[in-house]
């Protein structure tokens, strides 16, 4: 495979294969018949791409030789290649070697630069040679796949046969899985022999861990070997025994007595408890699963007796049932079990009740109790007896607090002396009152529904009277405070209203603070501190003082000085006689003096005053002004009264000599006028010139601004003088 392997594009109809310059032949001359000799449609291009990808995929892991554009050949294992690159095929070689250095003879130098992995970009690959490509990998993979699926298929068929014979369930428990009938193949055990030269431990010589009599401290070993100091404290997990306690011996004897009492109760057939207590048991017919992995689902003796009287579970399927729900009833509280059983037997017991009046009716037949009802009554009585025994044996393992004892005594005395409770029912004999048969039967039915517990004890419906039928008085609820009702106290009420009034307490605190002050009274504001503050859900400035809106004394003085300096600078800037409107800027508050002397100066380049004027001279620095032809000359309107106040030019524009100088005006060097007016210094004449000097001043307009602290006025005048 030679050439720059560029990825073919399905949108083009020409194949870009071979060398990157394959479109040019005979020394770079384009081949006119290239498109007519060989034409590739998209299907042919796709077939070539598939073949190339197949070869590259099968050559992964084999030796390849890559020739780069510089002529150097590299040999190595092909690890991966990028087929999505549009610049050719990127190649990654593992353990590269230099096979040919090409035009250069420095093979060793090239080999030193190579690492374990070499990445060659597609634009640098000129030739790729694949060696020893194994194209039979697909057949090997198919054969191995068929061998793997064959035993799996046989196992599936076996499971299907076993599933058809047994009940099909979606969820299988451990018992179902273990009893599925799979064949268990045991492996042949091989005797282990230690290798030659390896350290051999002889168990008979007492080198085992169990036979080591020396004490071993894991924390000390870790600290010695690894420098890890343990922070373990056994008292974080166990209760620390204080042996210095004077009651230590008494508590120790009590603990030993309780331990002996527990151990003397017997194991109840529990193998684990017997083993813990050191009792020898006969485990000849038990395996390890029965000894250590079995679960005793009987519970204690009370629940076992209750479960024996419950209905057997008719559902014997393979559905998984948690251990807590496998035997009904699953309630652990005996009171709940008793109430649930009484509700079930209530209707059955109510049908068996009868009255003497109903028995004496001519057409009525006295109902007889069936064996089923007798069994339910006997089971109920047995449960009641069990509950009585349980209540007698049960003891609270903790001492009752003293405050609870007072509450219990108070509740019992309240029940005895509470007059709001209805009176106890009074039992009457059947001969004390005669009722019609119809009324007697209907009353018996209603009363049997209301009080099933009294009927179950063998009393008839007319032999007793329920509480709801004898008393129609409304029961008043007991007082929340019990016998100790609170009494009103006017003094406490006044004290409560005074102590919790924030206005009164704030005034008292303010008066106490001013008691020791003998100075004269001043108008000090009276502040009341807010007792609490609840932050709102929106931004607020409630807690900010009004003083934050005014600056302090230092800041106010500094701001006043800054404003005063600013006013001085503004007044100096407004008094400037010259401004260049073409530049749009003020000339600043310069206090200048006229530069330039008579036009007949001996040195035209030094157009300055002689020693008689200012005692100094300044050289003339010409500053020509140029205007673009497409841009109008920015000439100010002289003496414009319609301009805004302060918005016009302060002094007339000083144009160049060829624009502003009139005929016969004195000219300086480079065609500029000899005198340029500046603002006069302090003590100058009214025209802005020095009092004892002479200079040329051009005609123009000027504006004078006078500002005071209270008012200002604007004067505009036109004057000309020499």
From Swiss-Prot:
Family: Belongs to the ataxin-2 family.
Subunit structure: Interacts (via C-terminus) with MKT1 (via C-terminus). Interacts with FIR1, IGO1, LSM12, PBP4 and PAB1.
Record's protein name: PAB1-binding protein 1
Organism lineage string: Eukaryota, Fungi, Dikarya, Ascomycota, Saccharomycotina
Record's compositionally biased regions (Low complexity): 307-316, 338-347, 356-370, 412-421, 456-471
Function: Involved in pre-mRNA polyadenylation. May act to repress the ability of PAB1 to negatively regulate polyadenylation. Negative regulator of poly(A) nuclease (PAN) activity. Promotes mating-type switching in mother cells by positively regulating HO mRNA translation. Localizes MKT1 to polysomes.
Keyword Mitochondrion set for record: yes
Chain intervals for the UniProt region annotation (Disordered): 1-38, 305-380, 412-488, 683-722
Keywords for the protein's UniProt record, in alphabetical order: Cytoplasm, Isopeptide bond, Mitochondrion, Nucleus, Phosphoprotein, Ubl conjugation
